[in-house]
Amino acid sequence: AEPSTLVEIKAERPDGKRDLELKWDKDRIYEQILGAWLGRAAGCLLGKPVEGWPKARIDKYLKDKKIEILDDYLPFDEKILPGVHKVSTKGNIKFMPRDDDMDYVIIGLLALENRGIKTSPRTLAHTWVDRLPFNLVYTAEECAYRNFTNSIWPPMSATHRNPFREWIGAQIRADIFGYVTPGLPEIGAKLAFNDASISHDKNGIYGEMFVAAMLSAAFKLESVKDIINAGLSEIPKNCRLSEAVRDTMHWCETLPSWELVWEKINESVGHYHGVHTINNAALIVMGLYFGENDFEKGIVCTVRGGWDTDCTGATVGSILGLRLGANNLPSKWISPLNDRLKSVVRDENDNKISDLAKR
């Protein structure tokens, strides 16, 4: 059985260091948080035009465009890509366009600004209703939002008429809870649990806790293996997500290329829906391993793996961006953003990314 309450999850997690005893350096922490925001935006933007595509379709698109090595944002092709994606393609980027992967970081920030460490599932639910338009949330989030409007509140909102509750929607909301808990993965995971439990259960919850804990740990830890293990230490040891992550770590350590690792991932968890938490989390782990010292390689191989490409690219970009810091991110990925982020969150429609990082 895979639990969905925080008490049970904590009881089944492996041993781990809950406080990494980070030495506080305000300027360095700001640079890391800014790097995370920028990295998240860049990874999301790279994956946005091909969201939902399988790897084979992405490979064909690159071949048709005569791109042997992907080392920049994707080119636009009006015959294949919808016009709405033009602003997300090479040479056409003026800012980070609206994406739900970025909206939820702002939503979480607003809830935290309101209630801080006391942010509860109910606080987050009310923040959604107050700040998010209903027609621009999807799958599990749409089901949960509908439940809120019918006075079905957490935790029941996660399971009532919600067949998507192990999909990736909670995992993409994790980042802010890691940003605000430097070196404290247990607290980051707890805040992520409060958020995830309004719309997800089981591995849907674990995905968000896993990512938040990794981000908290990345403020202090150097190796991606240690960062991933910090994430694993906050979720049940024997859940399907933990198993997929451990398998992927083994393949990354024993196989010479990300393509071979992808083959193993596809054989093992490729049967899940393309928007499920588990298979996409495996791609995130792959991207972290192969991008440990190379931001570009990390987001590129993750997005080329297919499935929910804007989500996985965003998470890998966020973790690597935080680990490396804003000053160490390649200009060709960051400069086109022009420090600007569009959003559908009420009263937060157009922000400077640097201002969001300061908050």
Feature-to-residue mapping (PLM):
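Catalytic phosphate/nucleotide-handling subdomain of diverse soluble enzymes
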Residues: 42-48, 53-69, 200-206, 210-212, ...
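An N-terminal structural lobe/cap that precedes and organizes the functional/catalytic core
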Residues: 14-42, 46-103
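Acidic, carboxylate-rich catalytic segments that either coordinate divalent cations
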Residues: 1-13, 238-274, 323-359
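Extracytoplasmic mature domains of secreted/periplasmic and thylakoid-lumen proteins
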Residues: 116-168
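Secretory-pathway/luminal and periplasmic proteins that interact with or process carbohydrate-rich
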Residues: 46-51, 117, 132-140, 200-201, ...
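Aromatic-rich carbohydrate-recognition surfaces in CAZymes
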Residues: 88-124, 128-137
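Accessory "access/gating" subregions that flank catalytic or transport cores
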Residues: 11-26, 145-168, 174-188, 192-199, ...
